[in-house]
Amino acid sequence: MEHAYIIDGRRSYIGVENGMYKHLPAEVLAAEVLCALVPEDVRQTVDEVIVGNGVGASGNIGRLATLTAHFPQAVPAYTVDMQCGSGLEALTIAAAKIRSGQADLIVAGGVDSSSTAPRRAYNRNHPDYERYGGEESFYSVAKFAPGEHDPYAMIRGAERVALDVQMTRQELNKWVLRSHSLAKQAREAGVLEPYLVGVQGATADAGIRDRISERFLNKLPTLLPAGAILTAGNTCLMHDGAAFLMVASERYVKEHNLTPLAEIVDSVTVGGNPDKSPETAILAIQKLLAKTKHTAEDIAVFECNEA
């Protein structure tokens, strides 16, 4: 079986909803990053482009972004929707295709624009049309599980898990402070500088809070009426951004005399209780460790999507 190597990557600076990219459609944001990542003379060697997208207009924004970036029309592209895991699933598919010998070079990643996401509403033929507002039935958060369409489903799930593991708001806020501190340190050290694309003149990620204190976090109101833990300060924001990696086979790496940045060793995808969605991160880690015959102690860094 082939090896799957990451040979390069780029991402935009991350903007918050209605911030620095508020008038920039997702396909244009993605195209800017794709152009910065893949040199023109390499684009014809790309076997396919896989784009994760969670809040777009459906269709095939991956193909639209690739054409907007002036890739050769012969390069196929498609879109993956696994909501918050869309970009990662695009990468998983890319690695699987490389390892199975179906491709030698794939560009994979994701893009979302909360600022320009289309307004979605129930069709008047839908049985829940009147229940959710009729002509004013616009929603921004998709329905994730059977039953009521609850825009706060993810927040309620996170609150349930926090209560189940007896996590206090004060404990959670300490992790928030740590997260922002580490992000700030990485920014000041220029850790990601070689991989950042200054779309529309952007020079910094908008979500990193330079001035934030435990006292401030502890004073914020909770998001849920009966909630005890989650606030606007310890939950993720809505963002605009794009990120892509070039994934190549060992054959491609040798042929072009490249030095890989990393190897994608393996991956798993799991499902779990939609009412307690954050728990699935634990299930995925456990399954992957068992599959690869590793223990947690063998891994230097774990990174979990906070959404």
Predicted features along the sequence, with ranges:
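Flexible glycine-/small-residue-enriched beta->alpha junction loops
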Residues: I106-R160
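Conserved catalytic cysteine-centered active-site region
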Residues: G52-D104, E148-A153, R211-L237
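Active-site-proximal alpha-helical scaffold in enzymes
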Residues: M82-D112, A162-L192, L245-R251
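Glycine- and Gly-Pro-enriched alpha-helical subdomains that act as flexible
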Residues: E250-D298
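N-terminal extracellular/periplasmic Venus flytrap/periplasmic-binding protein-like
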Residues: R11, H23, E27-E32, E171-E255
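Beta-strand segments within the central parallel beta-sheet cores of soluble alpha/beta enzyme folds
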Residues: R43-G52, A77-T79, I106-V111, E171-R178, ...
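Conserved active-site "lid/cap" helical segment
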Residues: M1-A69, Q73-P76, C84, G157-R169, ...
